[in-house]
């Protein structure tokens, strides 16, 4: 990727950069776009699939110019079929539908092939990120990408979860479009955002779609990036995204949030294994910050869980309050001093922080942070159990072993 600074795009430069993306070749380095602080008209925190899927579907069904979906996990099932039906209906109305999905998370060339054939036959343009050979196609049933190893691309997984409707409504969160997020087995959230900041989400999507070989007519640029009314856009909000290489604005922001907290700090994450970030959490607690760490009691990755639990003793000794949510807590969020909220897809483990495509929304608003506490943190705290230290020589040895392996997990 080269410089970690990336390409700085100001508020007036988004259209210019988008036009370059739509008319010329796009390399991986062109995805490294760093945005200045933006503005949102509204930011809503929606917790659990039963709360975020219905309005997300309603937004898709209301689309009049375009629907863009970037999803790590979009698979057949009750939830997936409902979304597929909504997308097919828009295609029948003549609305362009574009998708970027991850080969590992969505399996569009394997078990979900029929599901994606239905979408592409209806007219959806689908690009696939393949961690071993990130070569593109319009549709998922072309050349057999992924059969040939490309070690340089190993780990280039697209972990993002984004929906952009008409360039005016954006969704960013941690959940896939899959049944286990809709039936309560996985506990997650999405942020629904409107206002000028949606242009940033749209540009990130367009950059990835074009890098993967998708075609977007430059004549539609005005529809893709409609002029947003700034009059009511008073909420500071900025899109941060990581890309493979050395472009890691989310990682930088997480470190700053952990280091800058002075009064309170909430960390919500299913995979807390990065030693450097864990030490930052400990230091925050030691300097008197009230720290709550929300993690799952029953994680879906037992190796990561063992590595994480290895650090519980040091975290507890530092004064961190560990809260284990009873089901698979899958959300990723940070709240600093009741004012700053960072939420999206990035986990506190090495691959997310340094290798995957990730996306978060940074919101600097006491009212949005309070909304997060009311809808997520307070209810989660009420049903969570205190985190425990590993007990017994065997349990501690297993935890220590997996902690050593955590950069690979």
At which residue positions do the language-model features occur?
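Charged, low-complexity intrinsically disordered terminal segments
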Residues: 1-409
């Amino acid at each position: 990727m080269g410089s970690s600074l990336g390409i700085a795009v100001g508020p007036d430069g988004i259209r210019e950069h988008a036009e370059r993306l739509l008319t010329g070749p796009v390399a991986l380095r062109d995805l490294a776009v760093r945005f200045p602080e933006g503005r949102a008209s509204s930011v809503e925190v929606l917790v659990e699939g039963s709360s975020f899927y219905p309005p997300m579907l309603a937004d898709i069904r209301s689309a009049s110019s375009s629907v863009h979906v970037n999803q790590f996990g979009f698979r057949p099932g009750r939830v997936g079929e409902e979304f597929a039906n909504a997308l097919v209906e828009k295609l029948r109305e003549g609305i362009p539908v574009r998708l970027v999905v991850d080969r590992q998370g969505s399996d569009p060339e394997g078990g979900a092939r029929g599901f994606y054939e239905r979408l592409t036959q209806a007219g959806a343009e689908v690009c696939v990120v393949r961690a071993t050979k990130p070569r593109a196609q319009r549709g998922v049933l072309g050349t057999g990408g992924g059969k040939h190893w490309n070690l340089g691309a190993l780990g280039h997984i697209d972990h993002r979860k984004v929906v952009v409707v008409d360039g005016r409504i954006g969704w960013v969160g941690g959940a896939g479009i899959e049944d286990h997020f809709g039936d309560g087995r996985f506990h997650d959230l999405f942020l629904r955002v409107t206002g000028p900041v949606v242009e940033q989400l749209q540009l990130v999507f367009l950059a990835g779609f074009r890098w993967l070989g998708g075609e977007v007519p430059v004549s539609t640029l005005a529809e893709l990036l409609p002029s947003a009314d700034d009059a009511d856009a008073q909420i500071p909000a900025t899109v941060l995204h990581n890309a493979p290489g050395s472009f890691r604005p989310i990682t930088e922001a997480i470190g700053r949030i952990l280091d800058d907290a002075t009064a309170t700090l909430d960390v919500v994450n299913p995979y807390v294994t990065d030693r450097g970030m864990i030490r930052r959490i400990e230091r925050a607690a030691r300097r008197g910050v009230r720290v709550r760490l929300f993690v799952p009691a029953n994680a879906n990755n037992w190796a990561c869980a063992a590595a994480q639990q290895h650090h519980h003793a040091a975290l507890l000794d530092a004064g961190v309050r560990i809260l284990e949510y009873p089901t698979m807590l899958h959300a990723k969020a940070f709240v600093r001093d009741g004012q700053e909220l960072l939420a999206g897809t990035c986990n506190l483990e090495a691959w997310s922080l340094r290798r995957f495509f990730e996306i978060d929304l940074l919101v600097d608003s006491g009212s949005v942070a309070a909304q997060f506490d009311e809808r997520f943190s307070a209810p989660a705290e009420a049903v969570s159990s205190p985190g425990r230290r590993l007990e017994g020589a065997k349990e501690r040895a297993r935890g220590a072993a997996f902690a050593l392996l955590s950069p690979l997990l």
